[in-house]
């Protein structure tokens, strides 16, 4: 009986060791980290750091609104299986219908162990509207300096989960942030050359506060955030009255919103819509703006061109 007990203990010990070994994700085991990102922007930044070292799933499809989303069965499955989950935080996926909060709770995932806010360390800007005052503005990625913070946070967690690929992640992070930094410096110089009376970026959603602070271009909008009413007659009237007091040459409309309210503003002010720009999503693969870097470059170029008219 004693011998049988000893054998049972040895058997269970072997099973435990095998289980631990099979669960380890590193280059030597041949297993890739299963990573989930909540939207296409975060997914693209992650891809630039991790390359082919991970299996990556992006939840909110390209072109859709990440503020309020209903996860599909595939999203639930991937989140449950994920080793690492990246979300924006600061009132994006956890505001509105709080879809991300419900998703990670159902998947039994733990904050700062399984899922991480890539915006950690960003200098947060707050909303101003009557119904939203005091809430965080989530659109931090529209300042390239914050995009670099996102990249560093992502690399940090990849290294923590997959230390065997540390050098790979660090090299990619260095190359990527240098590229973003160069674009950021070019943008600041570009906007310095635009006359002050033309410096006003007008969009449907008031998502350009971080952009405005970074590049010295004030912003105006129809509605403040996509979780409130969008394009009401009162909102449109307020913006039209403001624009009639300015010399702004161009308007802009985002790729992920209904363009009809901005078309009404354009008709009422005789200010043309210069371009569609990207805010909550990158473009579809193969199109201009299909990465975080190219999306930001496209936005910076189009906004500078439009305001220089």
From Swiss-Prot:
Signal peptide boundaries: 1-19
GO cellular component labels: plasma membrane
Residues where lipid is bound covalently (S-diacylglycerol cysteine): 20
Domain of life: Bacteria
Positions bound to Mn(2+): 67, 139, 205, 280
Membrane disposition: Lipid-anchor
Keyword Zinc attached: yes
Gene3D superfamilies assigned to the protein according to its UniProt record, in alphabetical order: Nitrogenase molybdenum iron protein domain
Main location per the UniProt record: membrane
Functional description taken from the UniProt entry: Part of the ATP-binding cassette (ABC) transport system PsaABC involved in manganese import. Binds manganese with high affinity and specificity and delivers it to the membrane permease for translocation into the cytoplasm. Also acts as an adhesin which is involved on adherence to extracellular matrix.
PANTHER family: HIGH-AFFINITY ZINC UPTAKE SYSTEM PROTEIN ZNUA-RELATED, METAL-BINDING PROTEIN HI_0362-RELATED
Annotated protein name in UniProt: Manganese ABC transporter substrate-binding lipoprotein PsaA
Source organism of the structure: Streptococcus anginosus
């Amino acid at each position: 009986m004693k011998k049988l007990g000893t054998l049972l203990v040895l058997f269970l010990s072997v099973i435990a060791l095998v289980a631990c070994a099979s669960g380890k994700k590193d280059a030597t085991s041949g297993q890739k980290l299963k990573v989930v990102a909540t939207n296409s922007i975060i997914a693209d930044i992650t891809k630039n750091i991790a390359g082919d070292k991970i299996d990556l799933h992006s939840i909110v499809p390209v072109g859709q609104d990440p503020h309020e989303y209903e996860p599909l069965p595939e999203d639930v499955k991937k989140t449950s299986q994920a080793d690492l989950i990246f979300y924006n935080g600061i009132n994006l996926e956890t505001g509105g219908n709080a879809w991300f909060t419900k998703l990670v709770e159902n998947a039994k995932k733990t904050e700062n162990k399984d899922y991480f806010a890539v915006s950690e360390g960003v200098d947060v800007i707050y909303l101003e509207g009557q119904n939203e005052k005091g809430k965080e503005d989530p659109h931090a990625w529209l300042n390239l300096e914050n995009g670099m913070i996102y990249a560093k946070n992502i690399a940090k967690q990849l290294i923590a989960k997959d230390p065997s690929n540390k050098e790979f992640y660090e090299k990619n992070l260095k190359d990527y942030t240098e590229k973003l930094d160069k674009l950021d410096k070019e943008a600041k110089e570009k906007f310095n050359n635009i006359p002050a009376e033309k410096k006003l970026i007008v969009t449907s959603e008031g998502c350009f506060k971080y952009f405005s602070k970074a590049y010295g271009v004030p912003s105006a909008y129809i509605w403040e955030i996509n979780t409130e009413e969008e394009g009401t007659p009162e909102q449109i009237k307020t913006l039209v009255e403001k624009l009639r007091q300015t010399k702004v040459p161009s308007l802009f409309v985002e790729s992920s919103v209904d363009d009809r309210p901005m078309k009404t503003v354009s008709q009422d002010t005789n200010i043309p819509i210069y371009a569609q720009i990207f805010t909550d999503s990158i473009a579809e693969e193969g199109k201009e703006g299909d990465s975080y870097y190219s999306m930001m470059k496209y936005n910076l170029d189009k906004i500078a061109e439009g305001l220089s008219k």
